[in-house]
Amino acid sequence: VTMESKEHYYKLDQLNGRKIVVMGNHDLHQHTKELLNYVESVAGMIDYKGCCLTHAPIHPAEISFYRLNIHAHIHENKLQEIEYLSRYGDLGEKVEPTLHKYKCVDAKLIDFKPKTLEELLNE
């Protein structure tokens, strides 16, 4: 769900629970001050119970630091293993299979129904 139009921010008051926004590529950062009137905080990434919460999937070189990367952005939920340049300079190093550590929670893919962390960990 995008936060690009501040005219709908008031609807956030209708939601129960803590509201923390992880900004994405469609969110307008110049509206952050206004958004903070309706949510607890705004972040680019959150480390929660060893899980990395982001808008877009994190780089495969970073996934080993987390239990899961819970993200959206990939609306078709199609990630693939890739070769990458490790941050230590090794060329063409094949990453260990890690797709099971990426969980896409795009609103459309999860039928607009929230999932608990336990549900995501057990999928």
Predicted regions span which residues?
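Core catalytic region of metal-dependent phosphoesterases/phosphodiesterases
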Residues: 1-47
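Histidine (H) residue identity feature
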Residues: 8, 26-31, 55, 59, ...
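Short, conserved active-site loop motifs that form the nucleotide-linked donor/cofactor pocket
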Residues: 19, 36-40, 51, 67, ...
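Short, flexible, glycine/charge-rich loop motifs used to bind or transfer phosphoryl groups or to couple energy/partner
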Residues: 9-12, 43-44, 55-62, 92
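Active-site neighborhood of phospho(di)ester-bond hydrolases with catalytic His/Asp-centered motifs
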Residues: 1, 19-25, 53-54, 68-73, ...
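Binuclear metal-dependent phosphoesterase catalytic core
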Residues: 47-49, 59-68, 74-123
